[in-house]
Structures are given as C-alpha cells and as structure tokens.
C-alpha cells in the first residue's frame, strides 16, 4: 500500500551496501524509512533526505519498515547547518525525539524550533526547551515541581536531577547549589504549562543553552541512555 506523508528529517545513516535509513517525524509518529541505493553516486534521494528538511514523501508499507519511493522538499532549513551551536543543539533534540514515544505536539514545535534557528530568532532556546519538555513528559520522567520532592515543602531552593525534583533547604543538606528564585519559577512554569500557556512562558522567562543542556541530561539520566551528541554540545559550550 502506497501512502503520502509529510515529515521532518531527523537523521540519515548508511544501511547495508549503499542503502540508507532515514529517521523522520510525522504528525502522528516517528518512522524509520528504508531507501534503496541512497548512497550511490547517482542517487536522487540523497539531497532530499538531509536533516532539517521538511518533505513530502511517497512511501510503501513493508513488513519490516516503510520503503521511500519518491518525494519533494517543502522547505529546507539549510541555515541551521551553517551554525555550529544551533545545529549541535538540534542534533541533540533529534536524538532524544528518536528515542521518545510519539507526542502529538512535537511536529509543530520542532518546526517552530527549526524556523527560529534558521532565521536566527531570539526564541530558539525557548522552542528547544519546549521540545525537551514534551519528550520528558511523554517518557513520564518529568521533575516534581509542586514542592520538595521528598517532603512537599513549598519553600524550595534547588532542582535535583538525581532526586527527581525540587528540594527544600532541609532535604538538600547543602548537597547541590541553590538556584535563584527566577530559575526555580522558570522550571516550574515550564513543566506546569499547557499548550495554551506557551506564549506566557515565552514572554516571562528567558531560556538559553544551559537550560537545553540541563534538560537533555535530565532525559539522558532518567531514561538510562547515553547520547554522544550531548557530550559534544557540552564540549563546545564555552565557545559560544
């Protein structure tokens, strides 16, 4: 059965001899497409399946994985590839999305993120953190932000990755550095907000690469996986 889909290309890799696997995000799923002869010199599909491509694909459903037959590019966000920091951030997002159960909001949010990175807009890190918020929530590993994760005291002073939520002064025992009030409010707002409240969070709080890295490491730690893309992003953090 042949099906037409719209998809965002997350990654492409070689498979067997000259064939390829393309990981894509659609409106309702995360798919791995099989592409015959993708890495042959005369391949017409290689340019089509570059990361940061928003495409329309014709696929054929197969037993193991869908086969990509043909397609066309709706928009290629090529400027992202020219920015080491933004592209590295996006590759972290793509890796985490690829390991996540589908969240219905991810498609449009990732498009907003790509658009912001491509046009060098100020809200890129906000959208990146929203992508991570949805990934974390879909995995059921979101931090406890209604009070101290151990005693529910609402007078909290830090967010602990290992403990899984806010800590009050007593439960922290000076283990972790205190966060300023604005930072605590920001993370509570991030994980309490619904889709209709995103604009409020965007206007009232500033997000940066440190937030992106922290949320990425949160998902990495609590999902018990290792992502080299996060290590690379950390290694170039000081160059920004």
Roles of regions detected by a PLM:
Residues 1-20, 25-240:
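Non-catalytic alpha-helical scaffolds and adjoining flexible linkers that form interface surfaces
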């Amino acid at each position: 059965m042949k099906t037409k889909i719209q998809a965002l290309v997350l990654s492409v890799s070689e498979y067997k001899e000259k064939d390829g696997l393309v990981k894509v995000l659609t409106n309702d799923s995360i798919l791995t497409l099989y592409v015959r002869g993708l890495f042959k010199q005369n391949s017409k599909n290689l340019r089509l399946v570059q990361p940061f491509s928003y495409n329309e694909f014709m696929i054929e459903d197969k037993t193991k994985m869908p086969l990509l037959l043909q397609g066309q590019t709706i928009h290629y966000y090529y400027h992202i590839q020219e920015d080491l920091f933004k592209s590295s951030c996006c590759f972290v997002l793509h890796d985490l999305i690829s390991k996540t159960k589908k969240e219905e909001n991810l498609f449009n949010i990732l498009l907003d993120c790509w658009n912001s990175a491509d046009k060098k807009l100020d809200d890129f890190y906000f959208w990146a953190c929203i992508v991570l918020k949805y990934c974390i929530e879909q995995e059921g590993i979101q931090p406890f932000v209604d009070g101290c994760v151990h005693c529910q005291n609402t007078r909290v002073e830090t967010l602990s990755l290992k403990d899984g939520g806010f800590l009050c002064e007593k439960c922290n025992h000076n283990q972790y550095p205190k966060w300023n009030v604005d930072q605590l409010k920001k993370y509570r707002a991030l994980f309490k907000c619904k889709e209709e409240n995103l604009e409020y969070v965007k206007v009232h709080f500033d997000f940066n690469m440190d937030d992106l890295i922290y949320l990425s490491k949160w998902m990495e730690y609590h999902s018990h996986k290792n992502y080299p893309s996060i290590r690379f992003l950390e290694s170039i953090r000081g160059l920004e």
